[in-house]
């Protein structure tokens, strides 16, 4: 549902689509609490995915419209960090709700805030700052500075002699923003970002899916002790996303590729470490923390990169292409990791697979151009 949503948002704006998406997946969350059969639950889950799909595209487009170039990666990092914080906070809260009021109330309780937020979004949020009654003239000038001229895209990065060597390495190019749908689907930079994101999301979702079993079967953790340890990648990811967005914006002059490259390289190294990590609770906790940290330092840049390649009108479609690639990786990777585990009986093959994904991601990232 993401690519159709991207086309809709590009034409009609974020206000209605994002509100409808939040309302839709909140309603399906409520319906899960009413399910009486496995088949019914499957159909509800399908509806949940279809209605949830447009939301990331709309949120990324909101950041693109509402933040100046110097803050886009930082804003994206905060948004991504929130998605890392939720898996830390929600599981114990869900257990408490289930133990107190029953499992159905877990779904009812999490649906209600979403329904309220959907209404508030529609009432308060506008597609562009210029359409909002809450934005002052000074704020509007800060957000849109340099974006009203044809040469605006030349200001994507901060040009400085100190970055000369880095700029050669990351292939800084003077590129015109992609302004057509055909241009997006034939852009090596958009498609390359999509493929690299596919590879890195494959690692993240594969880890989140299989880490609990790895801890219990391979490292001998009990189910009680496994909970905190399994959350370490999310804790590291929360810190990494905010830090990575800040570094990309403030320390690297809005360059996106360096943090993307760091994430790919460090993830390969962390997979090697995980292959040889000792049977120690502290070592496993530290290892998983740094896996999440390294993975997420470059995460904001994968989204912010498309903001520099596409223009503001086509970016929702660009975001939908990139996010669809990531979601496909999140769909394929857990199954392939499970297949490898069945065939080899060892988690070493799974970590090798994740390392290969990160290495392929690095190769693709190196081929991308950094828009000047």
Residue ranges and their predicted role:
Residues 13, 34-40, 51, 67-68, ...:
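Helix-breaking motifs and short loop linkers at transmembrane-helix boundaries and internal kinks
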């Amino acid at each position: 549902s993401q690519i159709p949503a991207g086309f809709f948002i590009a034409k009609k704006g974020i206000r209605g689509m994002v509100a409808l998406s939040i309302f839709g997946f909140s309603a399906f969350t409520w319906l899960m609490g009413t399910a009486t059969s496995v088949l019914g639950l499957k159909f509800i889950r399908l509806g949940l995915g279809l209605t949830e799909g447009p939301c990331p595209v709309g949120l990324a487009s909101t950041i693109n419209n509402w933040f100046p170039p110097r803050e886009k990666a930082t804003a994206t990092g905060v948004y991504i960090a929130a998605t890392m914080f939720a898996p830390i906070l929600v599981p114990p809260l869900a257990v408490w709700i289930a133990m107190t009021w029953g499992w159905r109330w877990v779904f009812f309780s999490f649906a209600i805030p979403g329904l309220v937020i959907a209404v508030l979004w529609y009432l308060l949020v506008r597609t562009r700052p210029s359409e909002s009654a809450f934005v002052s003239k000074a704020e509007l000038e800060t957000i849109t500075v340099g974006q009203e001229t044809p040469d605006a895209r030349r200001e994507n990065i901060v040009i400085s002699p100190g970055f000369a060597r880095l700029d050669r390495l990351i292939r800084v190019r003077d590129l015109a923003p992609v302004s057509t749908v055909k241009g997006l689907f034939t852009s090596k930079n958009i498609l390359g970002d999509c493929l690299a994101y596919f590879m890195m999301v494959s690692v993240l979702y594969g880890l989140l899916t299989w880490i609990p079993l790895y801890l219990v079967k391979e490292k001998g953790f009990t189910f009680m002790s496994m909970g905190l340890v399994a959350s370490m990648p999310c804790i590291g990811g929360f810190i990494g996303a905010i830090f990575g967005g800040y570094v990309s914006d403030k320390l690297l002059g809005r360059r996106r590729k360096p943090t993307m490259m760091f994430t790919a390289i460090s993830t390969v190294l962390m997979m090697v470490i995980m292959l040889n990590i000792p049977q120690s609770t502290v070592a496993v906790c530290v290892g998983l923390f740094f896996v999440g940290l390294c993975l997420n330092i470059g995460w904001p840049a994968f989204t912010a990169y498309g903001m520099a390649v596409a223009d503001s009108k086509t970016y929702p479609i660009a975001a939908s292409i990139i996010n669809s690639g990531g979601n496909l990786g999140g769909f394929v990777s857990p199954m392939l990791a499970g297949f490898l585990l069945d065939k080899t009986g060892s988690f070493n093959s799974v970590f090798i697979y994740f390392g290969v994904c990160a290495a392929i991601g690095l190769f693709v990232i190196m081929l991308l151009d950094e828009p000047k």
